[in-house]
Amino acid sequence: MFKKFFIAILAAAAFTLAADPVTVEARLTEIPGKMPSNDLYSYVYVYKYKVLKVVSGKLDAKEILVGVYNPLIARGKVKDKMADKSKGNVGEFKAKAKHTLKIVPLEGNWDGAVEDEYFDDESPRYLAIEVNE
């Protein structure tokens, strides 16, 4: 009984540590395709970023694929259930812009529609829970 309890505690601790956000400074390299309007449905749109610096946490990738919830709405202006995962001060996403991103794995943090033009790229997807200029 104690052994099962101990294993459950270790598993929960590992999951908690793995879910800690990573903060990076990165440049938005491209905006693929056309974003759907927000009046159709809520979605996460995947952008490609070049990592310039890891500010906190651990990340080895030079490029990352980052999903942003309803990117046509300015960060900090999202008022629905995803408001806590849509923080920041970016008003509009533009190619070549430098952002400070707080990211978590997309899987497990978003289960809705994903607009992802990088279907041939098997890199992990992240969700930006905060984006600042």
Tell what function each PLM region has.
Residues 6-7, 37, 84:
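Generic detector of short alpha-helix boundary/capping microenvironments
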Residues 1-4:
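Positively charged n-region of N-terminal signal peptides that target proteins for export
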Residues 43-48, 52-133:
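Disulfide-stabilized netrin-like
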Residues 6-18:
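Hydrophobic h-region of N-terminal signal peptides that target proteins for export
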Residues 8-9, 32, 39, 79:
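A near-ubiquitous, low-amplitude feature marking generic local secondary-structure context
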Residues 20-52:
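Structural detector for short beta-strands of small beta-barrel domains
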